[in-house]
Design a protein with these regions (language model features):
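An N-terminal, well-structured beta->alpha segment
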Residues: 1-72
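Glycine/threonine-rich beta-strand-loop-alpha-helix active-site module
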Residues: 82-188
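C-terminal catalytic subdomain
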Residues: 268-277
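A short N-terminal beta->alpha junction/helix N-cap motif
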Residues: 19-23, 47-52, 75-78, 194-197, ...
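Carboxylate- and glycine-rich phosphate/diphosphate-binding segment that chelates Mg2+/Mn2+
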Residues: 159-264
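N-terminal small/polar loop signature for handling phosphorylated ligands or for N-terminal nucleophile
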Residues: 52-123, 238-250
Length: 277
């Protein structure tokens, strides 16, 4: 049998998967156990008005009946430093010790920003990647459990967040210490998504899978994950868009979203860069 020879690459690859993932219809029921596992006793739930209005937030809160829960539901469509600081004030007032993000990429990214400022000194910008701040984000960052309610960004398994800071810049914050300690991926939470949002977030997942696969770094596990995710999204995005109650399509789109972000560590491309410009 002929062997395929590995070609040398100029950059060393990091191959690391950290997040414990609960993935299934009804997985939201594991929320209390995951909180206990990661040491969260007084959680703050970070969400947005749309998730709250759709009743999805209440589904999460029902799992935590009897827990001392604080809620921050003012996440803007694009997370801002102002919103992060408002959430910090509520986090401190509630004597919280961890975070649960229930929503799409915006809520999860805001929670990651909050995980920094709630436990680290100085302004948020100090920890931005472009400012050399990634090494300053320590393991003391507040523990985070991510509960995605859309199938697109994959933020629940990603180590980065994008936040608009006070001077108007859109900055990235990246650290393995920002990885959610758990991701609860319950496709049931996405069945009520409008078709336009299903299509838009689904295309995000497709773009992630394509770009990560084509990135030049050597990371065979990421290649396999990205290709499988692309196949799932390619065959199910139209079905999920046409019929939001199609459970098989919803499950496969949530998987594709997660897989695209799991492969982020291999690298992305121009489309992703332009979307953050």
């Amino acid at each position: 049998m002929q062997r395929t020879h590995i070609q040398p690459h100029q950059t060393m690859s990091t191959i690391l998967y950290l997040t414990q993932i609960q993935f299934d219809f009804g997985a939201i029921a594991t929320l209390p156990a995951e909180c206990e596992r990661v040491g969260i006793r007084r959680p703050m739930v970070v969400t947005d008005a749309g998730v709250k209005a759709a009743g999805v937030l209440q589904t999460a809160l029902d799992q935590l009946a009897g827990w001392p829960v604080s809620i921050f539901s003012d996440t803007p469509p694009n997370p801002t430093e102002k919103a992060v600081l408002a959430a910090k004030a509520a986090y401190i007032a509630g004597e919280c010790d961890g975070l649960i993000a229930v929503g799409g990429g915006s809520a999860i990214d805001l929670a990651k920003g909050l995980a920094i400022v709630a436990t680290h000194e100085g302004p948020l910008t100090r920890y931005a990647t472009i400012e050399g701040g990634s090494p300053l984000i320590t393991p003391h960052a507040a523990p985070l459990i991510a509960v995605p309610t859309t199938a697109g960004t994959g933020s629940e398994v990603a180590r980065g967040a994008i936040i608009i800071v006070e001077d108007g810049r859109k900055l990235g914050f990246h650290s393995w210490n920002l990885m959610p300690k758990a991701a609860i991926c319950d496709p049931e939470l996405t069945v009520g998504l409008p078709s336009a949002l299903t299509a838009a977030t689904g295309m995000d997942a497709i773009a992630h899978c394509m770009e990560t696969f084509m990135a030049p770094a050597f990371n065979p596990p990421a290649d396999g994950i990205a290709l499988d995710g692309l196949e799932r999204a390619w065959h199910h995005i139209e079905r999920a868009t046409r019929d939001g109650q199609d459970r098989e399509a919803r499950l496969n789109m949530m998987s594709a979203s997660m897989q695209g972000a799991m492969a982020f560590q291999k690298g992305l491309g121009a489309v992703h860069s332009l979307s953050h410009s």
